[in-house]
Amino acid sequence: MPQRHSKNNNDLAYFTYDEKKKLGYGTQRERLGRDSIKPFDACSLCLKPFIDPMCCHKGHVFCRECILECFLAQKKDIQRRLAAHSSQKKQDKDEEEERLMLQKARELDEFDQQNHSAMPRNSDKNHNEDKNGFHGANSVKTTSFEEEALRTMKAFWLPSATPAASVRVDAPETHTVCPEGKEKLKLKNLFAIRFTEDNSEEEETKTKSASSSSYDKSYICPSCKVTLTNTMSLVALSSCGHVFCKKCAEKFMPVDKVCLVCDKPCKDRNLVGLKKGGTGFAEHDDHLEAKEYKHLGSGSGLGLVRPVKT
């Protein structure tokens, strides 16, 4: 009696979906949870609770030290690319001058041969000698020519004869960009933001009993005293840096035209919406699926240690 098909499901000429999952081959998708989502009070670069937070006009929050190091690294990379681009332009100019010199020398040589030669280049005597000297496709001259052609042939399927592609360096952008949103960003466009910490009695007893760290801090809206969480939409004032919940900012700021904490004048353009933190729920977050393409064979052994989800 033949065995069931489920016991012989690995002898097909192609990979099935189950075999791809077990081997980790192809496009792998993973559902991200709450632990993989950045909270609202974390730096977008170091992913740790921010220290001296700075914000751009798109709402991305960074540590002051992290964003300064990022700008410094971008400046160094721009200088390196500019140097490489200028070196390439100089090399192209030298090659163009050399090509023009060779072309001019070739034209002068042809002009000299046409005007000062005693006999034409292709005479009947030379033509007859060349004709008599040819002994067919098996001659030594033809064989050596074919061997030389094979050696210099641009066969892309041979590693030794693969033509090298010229690497061109494009002119780089001279401005720094936001590491999170990739838009143009300068240091003067950043502004410091100030969160209001929760100084209630429970928080005070908690900080006295345990070592105080930035992980234990919780922040509140200075207007409604509601604890700020990842589910709330936050608004920062670029004029003074204070952070409010979106409800208070839309309710009081357009009417009073001043900050509710320091009474500093503010306008509608000073309201900057901060990027919300992640909760891990599909209704709140947009991108909760990680995707990666892997080139793995059956002999890698990773299929044995990779967890298979059902």
Curated annotation (Swiss-Prot):
Biased composition (Basic and acidic residues): 122-133
EC number: 2.3.2.27
Molecular function per GO: ubiquitin protein ligase activity; zinc ion binding
Class of enzymatic activity (EC top level): transferase
Keywords: Coiled coil, Metal-binding, Nucleus, Repeat, Transferase, Ubl conjugation pathway, Zinc, Zinc-finger
A Pfam family assignment: zf-NOSIP
Main location as per UniProt: nucleus
Zinc finger intervals, RING-type: 43-67, 221-263
Region (Disordered) location: 110-138
CC per GO annotation: nuclear speck
Pathway in which this enzyme or protein is active: Protein modification; protein ubiquitination
Catalytic activity: S-ubiquitinyl-[E2 ubiquitin-conjugating enzyme]-L-cysteine + [acceptor protein]-L-lysine = [E2 ubiquitin-conjugating enzyme]-L-cysteine + N(6)-ubiquitinyl-[acceptor protein]-L-lysine
Localisation per UniProt entry: Nucleus; Nucleus speckle
Gene3D superfamilies: Zinc/RING finger domain, C3HC4 (zinc finger)
Regions annotated as coiled coil: 75-95
Gene Ontology biological process terms, A to Z: photomorphogenesis; protein destabilization; protein ubiquitination
Biological role stated in the UniProt entry: RING-finger E3 ubiquitin-protein ligase that plays an major role in maintaining COP1 homeostasis in darkness. Negatively regulates COP1 protein accumulation by targeting COP1 for ubiquitination and subsequent proteasomal degradation in dark-grown seedlings. Negatively regulates the accumulation of SPA1 protein in the dark.
Assigned protein family: Belongs to the NOSIP family.
UniProt protein name: E3 ubiquitin-protein ligase CSU1
Species of the source: Arabidopsis thaliana (Mouse-ear cress)
